[in-house]
């Protein structure tokens, strides 16, 4: 009931408020923003050491009080060709595009849902079956409940779906195998629930694959076209896209990821698997093979400058400059912690307890929210300190440490920088020791 009343409130506000003038980002210096420059220099040196130790490339940008106060790039956008180190790596720049991985969930799907809900075209309590035809339990399903699933259940990751059904891998997916977008939706409908909906929170890509399909159902447009035309273009963002190689970008503008396709250095095999270095194509297997590069859970590419505008839009309460995407009430609803688990908002992860330290560090306010991405991306938005941090990297662009023991652990993932919270803490420490 409270959620419904909040929704009605935000809808009333969004209908009565015309495009307002919101703060836009300007450039400033760390000193003027109150940062201890020596502490930031120490962080700079440490990141350089991590790159020297094998971490491929990093971009970091800091916003404080509507100003970009720090922006820097380290390392390489591409330094391997297959398993061979390049004689002349492609350097990372502050304009390099990165595969956002699961940050796609926030800066594509959540932004779309927040906009559509502000416009009254969606409701958090709407049933999934309202938008996805044929979404229902199968007679042989052990756990029932698909007919009761709401949009908010998917946003809270409490819908009952498994974390990763691996649809494109026939040996793992079995009868749920799909490497075709239309067929993938049918396979998602057939995917059995693993727990009773609403009984707990289990982070699942399937939730956001479904949410992406819902955005397409409501708008009548492919997800990428809708967000690029209705969200990014009005904000003046030209470097935030799905399938960048199909939209005018060159590989040299993009950070490469896994060295030998999706094979984890030769130990993973399935039909049509890529075997050459990912450079401009989404790394995520479900997004690439099962969804054609455009999915609600992964597939978006961007750079720190564009992400900064999107984070500032959240700090502003839903708008940027003369553009209003959604209302402040919508932002509040989406970033409020779930009663069952303080670390889950509606899609956004919230700094609700110490389990989020690897993401938000130890110094961010409890109201801080953001997300991470498997490729080495993290976004941190702190409305209390009116600050935001984005770190983009290409963590999988390194050899797998031990393919037989753990094919998902890359050598770069064993370095301290792979725990984003350390970098976040250094930013906060520099602010507190001004």
From Swiss-Prot:
User: What membrane topology does the UniProt entry give?
Assistant: Single-pass membrane protein
Q: Which residues cross the membrane?
A: 7-25
> Does the keyword Thylakoid belong to this entry?
no
| EC code | 3.4.16.4
Q: Keywords for this entry?
A: Carboxypeptidase, Cell inner membrane, Cell membrane, Hydrolase, Membrane, Protease, Transmembrane, Transmembrane helix
Q: Which Pfam families match?
A: Beta-lactamase
One GO cellular component term noted in the UniProt record for this chain: plasma membrane
What reaction(s) does this enzyme catalyze? Preferential cleavage: (Ac)2-L-Lys-D-Ala-|-D-Ala. Also transpeptidation of peptidyl-alanyl moieties that are N-acyl substituents of D-alanine
- Which Gene3D superfamilies does UniProt cross-reference here? DD-peptidase/beta-lactamase superfamily (3.40.710.10)
User: PROSITE patterns in the record, alphabetically?
Assistant: PROKAR_LIPOPROTEIN
GO terms, molecular function: serine-type D-Ala-D-Ala carboxypeptidase activity
Offer one example of a GO biological process linked to this entry: proteolysis
Q: Which SUPFAM superfamilies match?
A: beta-lactamase/transpeptidase-like
The enzyme class is: hydrolase
Q: Which PANTHER family match?
A: BETA-LACTAMASE-RELATED, BETA-LACTAMASE-RELATED DOMAIN-CONTAINING PROTEIN
Q: Which family does it belong to?
A: Belongs to the peptidase S12 family. YfeW subfamily.
- The entry's protein name is Putative D-alanyl-D-alanine carboxypeptidase
The source organism is: Escherichia coli O157:H7
Gene this chain is encoded by: yfeW
